[in-house]
Structure formats: C-alpha cells, structure tokens
C-alpha cells in the first residue's frame, strides 16, 4: 500500500510503498478515505526543532482521518466491517491511575499516532478497536469526519466552562480557534469576540458567522468593550494562539473571577503578571486533546443539532498532490486542508 512517510531526519515527505498492515486480535483495519493536515504534521514536514527532538524516522504521519472498516481482529465483536469511522489518536496505557479512574485523557503514558507511533497517512490503517469512533450521523461529509480530531480540541476547550450568556474572548483565528468560537456561539454565549493578526483568517471567521472579528494590530480590545457595552471585561477566554502577547492581553481584559482555557502552545517562555491573576481571582485551565470519549459524543451531538463546521475546510487535494497541500497548510493562511486517498483506488 501507499503511505506518506517521513523517511529521513530532514525536511520533506515521500509517498512510498510500505507493507500492508496486519490486524492483531483486538485491532481493526480501516481503509482510509480522507486525512486532515494538522500543525503537528507541518512541523514534522518542515523538520523544525520540535520535530527533530520528538520524531524518530522512518514514520508514517497523520492523526486526522476517516475511513471504512475492512477487517476485524479475532477478538473484536462490537464493530462491523463497512462501518464509517474516525479514531481517537491518543493511545493510552489503561493501567495508570488516571486510566483506571476513567480519565484516559489524563494518561501519563499517552502515545500519539503520527508522531510517536505510525499514523493514518496510509491506504490501510490498523488501530486498536478501543480507539475507533463510529459515525452514526446520516450523510456526514467525509471531509468533515476527517477533522473530528481538531474539532474535538475546539470542543474540549470551548466547553471547559459554561458559556451561556457569557462574553467570550477567543485569541487566535486558526481553524481550531474558529471552531471553538463557533461552539461557544452555538452554546449561547452573549458575545463572542475573535482576535488575530491575519485579516485573511479573520475574514474566514466572519464568513462562518463570527461577526465580531478583531485585528488587534489595528484595534485595541478596549474599543470592543465600548462596542458591546461591556463594563467589567470578558467572562471566559479561550487562548488558542500560543502567543504570550495574546495571553497577557486576555488576562488584562478578563472580569474578576474570569476563566481562561489554554490550548495554544507557546514556542517561547512567557512572563505573566501573577498579581493580576491572583487579585482578580482568574482561573486558568490547561487543555490538550479530547476527553475520551466524552468529547466525541459532544461533537456528534453538536453536528446533529445543526452546528456547521464544513466551511472551515478551505482546501482539498488528492493525496498525489500532498506537496501542494502541505505548502498551503504551512502558509498560515486559510482554514483546514483535507487530502483524499480514494484517488489511489
């Protein structure tokens, strides 16, 4: 079969032949239909400092995917060949304190597909049956099914705190930031304000229904307070950018008792004024991945209830044009990029 592989510790990827997978007793094999490109995949493609420290080559990339089950392991009896699925990309140990308490998203021994172990950028992907998510939404677009992983990051972050009737600030209008803002708005937030430095990404946010998109290189958040008759600041902050400047500004603009969820990962050290956090009694909650599988149930319910995230996918390519797809994904413009594997059939 074909797979998209980081063959050597240097920039670039190759679409090459690799052995077909073999299912263990508790595994399934999925015929991959679509895959999304994550920022992690871009880092590995470019072979930056993080990738050089983290990834061992050769490695099959990819953790955003959907496809059809084509084979079941001998001990798998609760899934069926032909089911349309995605998968939870975090493999957990099942034996640590968190796993035994049912908090698998907190497993200290987590391994991520596509960077710690081989991933889903391949025609046929084998994974544990316990990581498979079956899509039961009628007529779900495979492109949307392929991005349930990052959608889950957005949902997990946006729903850290109840946002009904609250004023919500989202810093970072990348795909996950926009999806988080859409979730907050869909859940009944009073005002949702999205900030970024990119007019292109803010325009995409507006096209998807987030009318309060602010370029903070030209407009300060204090003008937003006036626009929405805000007297005390934002109730909830969702920091999606990894920018120290954005986090500092968010803290400055929170109401007393405000709550911040952090998903964006800083690339450098950040200096914070802890006196503001302490005396304003601000709660800061770190977030990674998804709750397994509670977030997946929530995602499916949101889609069934009418939340439309399809517009976040702005570019689609056959896998044979992966180089163009990765160049677009790495440009920092636009939304999600999805690659189609069915062209290899």
Curated annotation (Swiss-Prot):
Catalytic residues of the enzyme: 40, 43
UniProt subcellular location: Cytoplasm
Pfam short name (any one): ADH_zinc_N
InterPro entries: ADH-like_C (IPR013149), ADH-like_N (IPR013154), ADH_Zn_CS (IPR002328), GroES-like_sf (IPR011032), L-Threonine_3-DHase (IPR004627), NAD(P)-bd_dom_sf (IPR036291), PKS_ER (IPR020843), Zn_alcohol_dh (IPR050129)
Cofactor names: Zn(2+)
A GO molecular-function annotation: L-threonine 3-dehydrogenase activity
GO BP terms: L-threonine catabolic process to glycine
Binding site for Zn(2+) 1: 38, 63-64
Site residues, Important for catalytic activity for the proton relay mechanism but does not participate directly in the coordination of zinc atom: 149
Catalytic activity reported: L-threonine + NAD(+) = (2S)-2-amino-3-oxobutanoate + NADH + H(+)
Entry keyword Oxidoreductase: yes
Cofactor binding comment, as recorded: Binds 2 Zn(2+) ions per subunit.
Family: Belongs to the zinc-containing alcohol dehydrogenase family.
NCBIfam families per UniProt: PRK05396.1 (NF003808)
Subunit text: Homotetramer.
Protein name: L-threonine 3-dehydrogenase
Originating organism: Cutibacterium acnes (strain DSM 16379 / KPA171202)
